[in-house]
Amino acid sequence: GNTAFKWGIHDGYQWLQKGIASYECLTSIKNDFRKLLNPSAIIISHVSRAITKQQINQLISIWPTEVYWVVSQSAQCGVFNSYQNAAQLGSDRWASLIAAWSNVHEACLVINVGTAMTVDALSDSGKFMGGIILPGVNLMRHTLSLGTQLSDPILVGAYKNLPTNTNDAIYSGVIYGLIGSIERFYNLFSLELGRPIIRCIISGGDAPVLIPFMKLPIIHVDHLVL
């Protein structure tokens, strides 16, 4: 991901172990990885900086296993890619679309809320119809603090329907913006299909921040890509 490294061990039936670490701590978990059995396959989705890819390569070099780096395809695992340049679609979004399709096999929204928020549309035939990318909760707040001349430091506010202080106004504005974007995308995609979408899969570290404000038919999956 953009800010964290997530990993999991799967035996073909279930997840045996999962973990998460900041990129600053990748070196320190190498000893933990040495205690694991040699994996028969290593599959990686990487959307961060080139230097983090080097760190990941060093981390997994303890195993002789061949590594598969996920790259978006024109079609894969029953999902068809409508991006003008298929390879330009982020591997995390592509993996999420494949995971969502394997779960529901029908039209749905795929929402990931992390450093950035993505909202993607899957049709009944498994076709990725398109999607949007926005700053996530914290990035939107941080960007606002950098781009404005507020006299006081921005603190974490609370959501209010009608905020009466700056911190609450900023936090509430972020929620308004992200929820409003999801709902607009949901409505437009439902019109495109000719019926309401009955499943919206949501994942990502900040999904719990938005879920209380969502009035859509959501399915929360903690780690959709994994």
Predicted regions: what is each one?
Residues 158-199, 206, 217-218:
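Adenine-nucleotide phosphate-binding core of ATP-dependent small-molecule kinases
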Residues 4, 45-52, 197-213:
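Glycine-rich phosphate-binding loops at beta-strand->alpha-helix junctions
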Residues 1-16, 100, 104-128, 144:
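Gly/Thr-rich phosphate-binding beta-strand-loop-beta motif of the actin/hexokinase/Hsp70
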Residues 77-108:
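Conserved phosphate-binding catalytic cores of ATP/NTP-utilizing and phosphoryl-transfer enzymes
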Residues 98, 102-105, 129-174:
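Glycine-rich phosphate-binding loop plus the immediately following alpha-helix
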Residues 9, 60, 77-80, 209-216:
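Short loop/helix-cap segments at secondary-structure boundaries that form the rim of catalytic
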Residues 1-76:
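N-terminal glycine/serine-rich phosphate-binding loop of ATP-dependent small-molecule kinases
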Residues 149, 175, 218-226:
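Glycine-rich phosphate-binding/hydrolytic loop that grips phosphoryl groups
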